[in-house]
UniProtKB/Swiss-Prot annotation:
NCBIfam families, alphabetized: NuoD, PRK06075.1
Task of the protein: NDH-1 shuttles electrons from NADH, via FMN and iron-sulfur (Fe-S) centers, to quinones in the respiratory chain. The immediate electron acceptor for the enzyme in this species is believed to be ubiquinone. Couples the redox reaction to proton translocation (for every two electrons transferred, four hydrogen ions are translocated across the cytoplasmic membrane), and thus conserves the redox energy in a proton gradient.
Subcellular location(s) of the protein: Cell inner membrane
Protein name as it appears in the record: NADH-quinone oxidoreductase subunit D
Species, as recorded: Campylobacter hominis (strain ATCC BAA-381 / DSM 21671 / CCUG 45161 / LMG 19568 / NCTC 13146 / CH001A)
Organism taxonomic ancestry: Bacteria, Pseudomonadati, Campylobacterota, Epsilonproteobacteria, Campylobacterales
Length: 408
């Protein structure tokens, strides 16, 4: 039998039992349900998991170190590749942190556009979660339905930014362009149709006996476990702790919007699925409320901060000083004041935070990204023992991790 203890010092503090009938099973990193390059070393007794240890790092790209060698504007598209399923959330989180450090006041219309794009990102991310999670367990029909609606959402994002996955649609100080003609009408048409689609997903799953058996009372996370392991987002709310940064520490225009924070008490895979589904309904409510606010706003999408933000194209073409300032910002980069700052936002997967330590140069001295998937991956060691091997895919799927976030 293989000697799992040869994995040391990779698993420095773990001793796997070689006595008796226990077996060591390697899950991933090429498993189709691993949601990236996740590896799990499982000690199993028959079908029961005795010990689980996640192995990460297969997608490490040194994103935080890259930031130290780029000007702030250059790093924005790199954030697309952290959580590449909801790239706009990363764009906004980084830009908002730099804006707060520099004291940049973003115009209201830009804030409304950002809010709409963030909620579309949330829906697209949740649809991918629901479709792949159902497919992992064997429900193929839901996968086909969710990807049908996700195409509509990606088309809306593409019509604004020109890209479907890595958007780079937010810039430091505002937005690149205003919404195109007809975009709001297409958004409202989607918001009118989408709640019926969500009801179809629930009709397919909530009456499916196999789905209920595979998700209820599986992968239970208690409130205490969720808090001690640093869980956030749905992973925390589904365990009975109602915490959403959009409500508790509002940013953009979330304090003006009427929406609920779904949560559950059970803490199992089914509770997490229900929270994700209900969150999509709340995102539709937010998008619907944003439309009249956008129409009533002043058509201004860039901040008046020439020290940090380039002027609009018309101004660049007509004012010599603006063109010179633009040249300096592009070639040398903006230079925030000295200091350090941490800013957290509610990404589709949980608390996404950016910490920047600035020494007054055009690149951060240190950048740290607090990604929710990293903490959610760490909890597997707590909740997988006692579960069956077949439940591993259900637990991983319901935690909705992205390995680009875990490894960075």
């Amino acid at each position: 039998m293989q000697d799992p203890n040869k994995l040391r010092p990779f698993f420095e503090n773990v001793e796997f039992n070689r006595e008796g009938s226990n077996m060591i099973l390697n899950f991933g990193p090429q498993h189709p349900s691993a949601h990236g390059q996740l590896k799990l070393v499982l000690e199993v007794d028959g079908e029961k998991i005795i010990k689980a240890r996640p192995g990460i790092g297969y997608m490490h790209r040194g994103v935080e170190k890259m930031a130290e060698n780029m000007i702030y504007q250059e790093f924005v598209p790199v954030t697309d590749r952290v959580d590449y399923i909801a790239a706009g959330s990363n764009n906004y989180g980084f830009c908002a942190t730099v804006e707060k450090l520099c004291g940049i006041d973003v115009p209201r219309r830009a804030q409304i556009i950002r809010t709409m794009l963030l909620e579309l990102n949330r829906i697209a991310s949740h649809l991918l979660f629901l479709g792949t999670h159902a497919l992992d367990i064997g429900a193929m029909t839901v996968f086909l339905y969710t990807f049908r609606e996700r195409e509509y959402v990606l088309d809306l994002i593409e019509k604004y930014s020109g890209a479907r996955l890595t958007h780079h649609n937010v810039k430091i100080g505002g937005m690149f362009v205003d919404l195109p003609d007809g975009w709001l009408d297409e958004l409202l048409a989607f918001c009118e149709k989408f709640p019926r689609d969500i009801a179809d997903y629930e009709a397919l799953l909530d009456t499916n006996r196999i789905w209920l058996l595979r998700t209820q009372n599986v992968g239970v996370i208690t409130k205490e476990q969720a808090l001690s392991c640093g869980c956030s987002g749905v992973m925390l709310r589904a365990s009975g702790y109602k915490w959403d940064i959009r409500k508790e520490e509002p940013y953009l225009i979330y304090d003006e919007l009427d929406f609920d924070v779904p949560y559950a008490e059970a803490g199992d895979c089914y509770a997490r699925y229900k929270c994700y589904v209900q969150e999509m309904r709340e995102s539709v409510k937010i998008l619907t409320q944003c439309v009249p606010l956008y129409k009533a706003s002043e058509p201004k999408i860039l901040a008046d901060s020439p020290e940090f933000v380039s002027a609009g194209k018309e101004q660049l073409m007509s004012q010599n000083y603006s063109l010179m300032q633009h040249f300096v910002l592009i070639t040398q980069g903006l230079k925030p004041p000295e200091g350090e700052i941490y800013l957290a936002t509610e990404s589709p997967k949980g608390e996404l935070g950016f910490y920047i330590y600035s020494v007054g140069e055009s690149s951060p001295y240190r950048l740290k990204i607090r990604c929710p998937s990293f903490w959610h991956c760490a909890i597997y060691e707590e909740i997988m023992p006692g579960q069956y091997i077949a439940d591993v895919t259900a637990i991983i799927g319901s935690s909705n991790i992205i390995l680009g976030e875990v490894d960075r």
